[in-house]
Amino acid sequence: MSFKPLHDRIAIKPIEHEEKTKGGIIIPDTAKEKPMQGEIVAVGNGVRNKKGEIHPLELKVGDKVLYGKWAGTEIEIKGEKLIVMKESDVFGIIN
């Protein structure tokens, strides 16, 4: 991937949920909820404070995270769908 987020932004590859219910019913795209789990594929350098110092982000590439249903902006890079959002939009890291 050739995308580098700026400042306190991160790029997440959403983890898709099952497209079929346990009973075998196929869920159409229009009825699916936006994924709320993903893997971080790129991070920005960090946030600059009032003194001009850069504080690096806590999240790193490879972290699996939970984020808000409507957080971020969807983009497509080389056919891969990503969501770009601020680090503060992430609820936490999944272990």
From Swiss-Prot:
The cellular component terms of Gene Ontology attached to this UniProt record, alphabetical and capped at eight, are:
cytoplasm
Q: Name one GO biological process term.
A: chaperone cofactor-dependent protein refolding
Reply yes or no: does the keyword Cytoplasm apply: yes
Q: Which GO terms describe its molecular function?
A: ATP binding; metal ion binding; protein folding chaperone; protein-folding chaperone binding; unfolded protein binding
Q: Which UniProt keywords apply?
A: Chaperone, Cytoplasm
Where does it localize?
Cytoplasm
Matching SMART domains: Cpn10 (SM00883)
* A Pfam family that the UniProt record links to this protein: Cpn10
SUPFAM superfamilies the record matches: GroES-like
Q: Which HAMAP family match?
A: CH10 (MF_00580)
What family is it from?
Answer: Belongs to the GroES chaperonin family.
Subunit-structure text:
Heptamer of 7 subunits arranged in a ring. Interacts with the chaperonin GroEL.
**What is its biological role?**
Together with the chaperonin GroEL, plays an essential role in assisting protein folding. The GroEL-GroES system forms a nano-cage that allows encapsulation of the non-native substrate proteins and provides a physical environment optimized to promote and accelerate protein folding. GroES binds to the apical surface of the GroEL ring, thereby capping the opening of the GroEL channel.
Q: What is this protein called?
A: Co-chaperonin GroES
Organism equals Rickettsia akari (strain Hartford)
Question: What does UniProt list as this organism's lineage?
Answer: Bacteria, Pseudomonadati, Pseudomonadota, Alphaproteobacteria, Rickettsiales
Gene behind this protein: groES
